[in-house]
Design a protein with these regions (language model features):
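Basic, flexible Lys/Arg- and Gly-enriched helix-loop patches that mediate nucleic-acid binding at interfaces
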Residues: 9, 14-253
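Basic polycationic patches enriched in arginine
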Residues: 5-6
């Protein structure tokens, strides 16, 4: 049986009653919206009975999602991880040779915000706070993500201009938001996006006949790869974490 392990004990939290969707989000299970869906589908139990939407629970209650027991983690955790190339984010990929969960050994279950495809590398943020994950991934918030990109042929001024103005992606039937882009070499550029469409940069480049040969995410909001080597991770500093929560419009509790 999988268990969300307690990072530190806090008697006051055991006594405090909170709505069950918030309880699940606080402990890194999912966002509140996803929690409401799980509750509506009868997949959450409290002390052996099916939980109801809007009911309140505390640390003494036995809360399960399916067969997985949820225990309260008093401390909010955010990790910065340097994902190497060849590593898959999604645990649902049956063909994945190596998962990020194989590389991160941490005492609390954490979930990533904004995946990178297998052939991409760079910064992933992971947390046990479902509300933070949801806030970081919400496209309407316009959070910045910065990338270094290498393509297969020489970059032109026309390419940069069109990429920066927004690109219609036929497969997704959407036009990307205008973005900041800067040439850094004959075949390389840096780009700052404020949305996270599936394989967005690769699709944008392909629209103009370019193929991406290397893609690295170097920044998410105020967090960078500084000090990290491929495959390594670290906890955010208190200052970094406080700013991240503030920029997401959340209060860390």
């Amino acid at each position: 049986m999988a268990i969300f392990r307690r990072l530190c004990y806090n008697k006051e939290m055991d006594e405090m009653k909170i709505r069950i969707n918030k309880y699940l989000a606080m402990n890194g299970v999912c966002s509140r919206r996803e929690a409401d869906r799980l509750l509506s589908e009868g997949k959450v139990t409290v002390n052996g009975r099916i939980a109801k939407l809007g009911e309140e629970v505390c640390g003494h209650d036995c809360v399960k999602v399916g067969n997985r027991k949820v225990e309260p983690a008093a401390k909010k955790v955010v990790l910065a991880f340097f994902k190497p190339r060849g590593v898959t984010c999604s645990e649902k990929d049956p063909h994945a040779e190596k998962l990020i969960t194989d590389m991160i050994s941490y005492p609390v279950r954490v979930t990533y915000a904004g995946r990178l495809d297998k052939e991409s590398e760079g910064l992933l943020l992971l947390s046990n706070d479902g509300d933070l994950i949801q806030a970081m991934m919400k496209g309407s918030h316009g959070h910045e993500k910065e990338y270094q990109v290498r393509v297969d042929r020489e970059i032109t001024d026309d390419f940069l201009k069109k990429m920066g103005a927004g690109v219609y992606l036929k497969e997704l039937e959407v036009t990307t938001r205008p973005c900041k882009i800067e040439k850094t070499g004959k075949y390389t550029f840096q780009i700052i996006l404020t949305q996270g469409l599936n394989r967005q940069i690769r699709r944008m480049c392909r629209t103009f006949g370019y193929e991406v040969r290397g893609l690295k995410r170097i920044r998410v909001m105020n967090i960078t790869l500084k000090g990290l080597k491929p495959g390594a991770y670290r906890e955010l500093t208190e200052e970094e974490q406080n700013r991240l929560y503030a920029d997401c419009g959340l209060k860390e509790k």
